[in-house]
């Protein structure tokens, strides 16, 4: 398996825009949020924003997720007359949106021209993207996004035209700067508490690709691992360095997809499952995706790893058996 830590989380960029999901705190009924109050300072839009929770009403838990990319950035020009977009999910970088309604045109696929147009009014930054879809053809024609800075963070509203069949007219999400997102509360534990993860684990993805994680036995307060994914052509398409280490009375899970800089998750919960197995949960609310990594060992010795958001959505699931079985 590869617990790939993609910064843009492309899976949600389009599907969530087409109609995603209720507040992360919702179980069966959405919570009631106080009316939001705009901050008129456009400069507060600047910086990198991380998805926190869904604020769309009326969707089941499995559809919870961000209304656009789980991480994006904006930069307000010094003259306060334009905003530069990055990571907004349209496949374009450094898109300059003028606030006077002037169109920004970018060459798209199949010689089509994608047009951006934005405005700033009453504390709300809004822009639309016209993908130039031909009438009667499938796909998104116009994408509209609104950004409102409030005391609790950035409220993002996304609507598509035409709306997806069965999808919401508008999706809403809360974003914050990473430093404004509370850290996870760590659980007390030692490396012995997750020793059951040790071993050589192999599996097969629905695509036919083979996956493996090879975990060393616990020693010196740590466990080390390497993950690898090989496609049906026999080519390695992903690898990852992993480790679990003791720190300040708890455990930290560190992942380096492709050998990149590490991302850390803290152990927040561990223990037996209702079915007689074992479970360990590692969280990092400040990461864009995944925010949670869960390992479970079933009573019959099968290992499962899932990656996803803290609440809701459809986690990615990886299933393993011991190589020597």
For each of these PLM feature ranges, what is it?
Residues 28-325:
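Hydrophobic small-molecule pocket/channel-lining residues, especially in calycin-type beta-barrels
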Residues 7-20:
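Bacterial N-terminal signal peptides
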Residues 1-4:
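N-terminal secretory signal peptides that target proteins for export/translocation
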Residues 17-29:
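Signal peptide processing junction and immediate N-terminal pro/mature segment
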């Amino acid at each position: 398996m590869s617990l790939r830590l993609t910064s843009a989380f492309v899976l949600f960029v389009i599907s969530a825009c087409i109609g995603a999901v209720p507040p992360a705190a919702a179980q069966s009924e959405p919570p009631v949020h106080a009316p939001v109050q705009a901050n008129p300072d456009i400069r507060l839009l600047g910086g990198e924003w991380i998805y926190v929770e869904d604020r769309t009403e009326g969707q089941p838990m499995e559809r919870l997720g961000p209304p656009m990319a789980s991480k994006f950035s904006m930069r307000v020009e010094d003259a306060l007359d334009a905003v530069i977009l990055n990571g907004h999910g349209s496949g374009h970088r450094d898109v300059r949106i003028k606030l006077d309604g002037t169109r920004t045109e970018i060459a798209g696929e199949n010689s089509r021209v994608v047009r951006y147009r934005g405005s700033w009014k009453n504390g709300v930054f809004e822009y639309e993207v016209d993908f130039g879809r031909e009438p009667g053809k499938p796909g998104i024609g116009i994408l509209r996004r609104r950004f409102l800075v409030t005391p609790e963070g950035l409220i993002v509203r996304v609507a598509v035209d035409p709306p997806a069949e069965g999808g919401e007219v508008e999706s809403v999400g809360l974003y914050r700067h990473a430093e404004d997102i509370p850290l996870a509360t760590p659980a007390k534990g030692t490396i012995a508490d997750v020793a059951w993860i040790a071993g050589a684990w192999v599996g097969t993805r629905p695509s036919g690709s083979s996956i493996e994680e090879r975990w060393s036995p616990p020693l010196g307060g740590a466990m080390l691992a390497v993950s690898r994914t090989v496609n049906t052509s026999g080519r390695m398409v992903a690898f990852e360095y992993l480790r679990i280490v003791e720190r300040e009375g708890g455990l930290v899970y560190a992942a380096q997809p492709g050998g990149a800089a590490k991302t850390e998750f803290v152990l927040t919960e561990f223990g037996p499952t209702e079915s007689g197995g074992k479970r360990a949960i590692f969280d990092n609310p400040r990461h864009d995706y995944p925010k949670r990594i869960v390992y479970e060992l079933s009573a019959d010795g099968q290992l499962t790893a899932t990656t996803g958001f803290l609440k809701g959505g459809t986690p990615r699931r990886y299933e393993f058996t011991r190589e020597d079985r």
